[in-house]
């Protein structure tokens, strides 16, 4: 009888000691994991920026304005800036170290050396055919040319907005524009666009579908054409497809990481007359024509004010991507 009681008590004590040991081991293990986790957080925290999914999020649906974010660092410390200029600027300056000089001047405005890229283009016409905007912020300098007003205004409309585009087969199909945001964008070395509106019986309205010479010519030998026709009406098109491509595009909204600066000219380019264009006067501006050195000095002086009217975006613009969202 006493042997059974002693055995029971001994079993209980052994179980208690074993359980106590297991709990202490588990506690030590959890302490190790927690302390190690906290140690890693302490080490990595200076290297990690806080994420705020509301950064630059619009309240009204417009992305033209930046909104304050307590975790957002100074723009120029984490961003790249591309400055696009015509070849004539470099030719006039005629100084092999002029880019280095400007880089040092941008440094005085807070932009580290290496964060500003200078991109040269031959002329407005060639830039219209193949615009490529890859930096976080892009500023395009366009010297006014009366002979290129159409290309300049349409280039501004192209790069200041985002477009969703698809290819068009004008040899097989008629096309219509569904609403004001729907446009046909043509690019090439020479684009001549003719259209013939059709009635419900697919007969030409004021033109013959079998005679291209009766079509209405809406663009002649241009590099870039954004065609706008009457919505909801089928059209037969004639395009110089050997030197031009045409795409059916939908304007999605403003591209906030691009600004256009018109250099000189008595006429001021304005694309805001289009009902689908959100007010963009802050990102399309004009400065008086001066020597190119003076133009660049002006840009350096006001670069941070210009950036404040923009929003950083990661999506790049490449004309080859116009079949998809650009």
From Swiss-Prot:
Q: Which InterPro entries does the annotation name?
A: VP7, VP7_1, VP7_2
Q: Does the keyword Disulfide bond apply?
A: yes
GO molecular function annotation: metal ion binding
**Modification comment:** N-glycosylated.
Where it mainly occurs, coarsely classed, is: virion
> Which residues does Ca(2+) 2 bind?
177, 228-229, 231, 301
Signal peptide limits: 1-50
Detail the disulphide connectivity of this chain as listed in its UniProt entry: 82-135, 165-249, 191-244, 196-207
**Annotated family:** Belongs to the rotavirus VP7 family.
Self-association or partners: how does it assemble? Homotrimer; disulfide-linked. 2 Ca(2+) ions bound at each subunit interface in the trimer hold the trimer together. Interacts with the intermediate capsid protein VP6. Interacts with the outer capsid protein VP5*.
- Leftover remarks: Some rotavirus strains are neuraminidase-sensitive and require sialic acid to attach to the cell surface. Some rotavirus strains are integrin-dependent. Some rotavirus strains depend on ganglioside for their entry into the host cell. Hsp70 also seems to be involved in the entry of some strains. In group A rotaviruses, VP7 defines the G serotype.
Q: What is this protein called?
A: Outer capsid glycoprotein VP7
Organism (species):
Rotavirus A (isolate RVA/Dog/United States/K9/1981/G3P5A[3])
């Amino acid at each position: 009888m006493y042997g059974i009681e002693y055995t029971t008590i001994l079993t209980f004590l052994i179980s208690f000691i074993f359980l106590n040991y297991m709990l202490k081991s588990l506690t030590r293990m959890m302490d190790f994991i927690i302390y190690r986790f906290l140690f890693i957080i302490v080490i990595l925290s200076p290297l990690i920026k806080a994420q705020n999914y509301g950064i630059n999020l619009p309240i009204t649906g417009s992305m033209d304005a930046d909104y304050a974010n307590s975790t957002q660092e100074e723009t120029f410390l984490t961003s790249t800036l591309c400055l696009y200029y015509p070849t004539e600027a470099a030719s006039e300056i005629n100084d092999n170290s002029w880019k280095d000089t400007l880089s040092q001047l941008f440094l005085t405005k807070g932009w580290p050396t290496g964060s500003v890229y200078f991109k040269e283009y031959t002329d407005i016409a060639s830039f219209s055919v193949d615009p490529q905007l890859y930096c976080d912020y892009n500023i395009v300098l366009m010297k006014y040319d009366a002979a290129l007003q159409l290309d300049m205004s349409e280039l501004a409309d192209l790069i200041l907005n985002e477009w969703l585009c698809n290819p068009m087969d004008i040899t097989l199909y008629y096309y219509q524009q569904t609403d004001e945001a729907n446009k046909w964008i043509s690019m090439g070395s020479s684009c001549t666009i003719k259209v013939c509106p059709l009635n419900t019986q697919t007969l030409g309205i004021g033109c013959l579908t079998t005679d291209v010479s009766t079509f209405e010519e809406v663009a002649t030998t241009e590099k870039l054409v954004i065609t706008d026709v009457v919505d909801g009406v089928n059209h037969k098109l004639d395009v110089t497809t050997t030197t031009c491509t045409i795409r059916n595009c939908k304007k999605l909204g403003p591209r906030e990481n691009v600004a256009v600066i018109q250099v000189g000219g008595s006429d001021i380019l304005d694309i805001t007359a289009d009902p689908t264009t959100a007010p963009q006067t802050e990102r399309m501006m004009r400065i008086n024509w001066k020597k190119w050195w003076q133009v660049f000095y002006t840009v350096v002086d006001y670069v941070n004010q210009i950036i404040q009217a923009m929003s950083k975006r990661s999506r790049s613009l490449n004309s080859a991507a116009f079949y998809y969202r650009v």
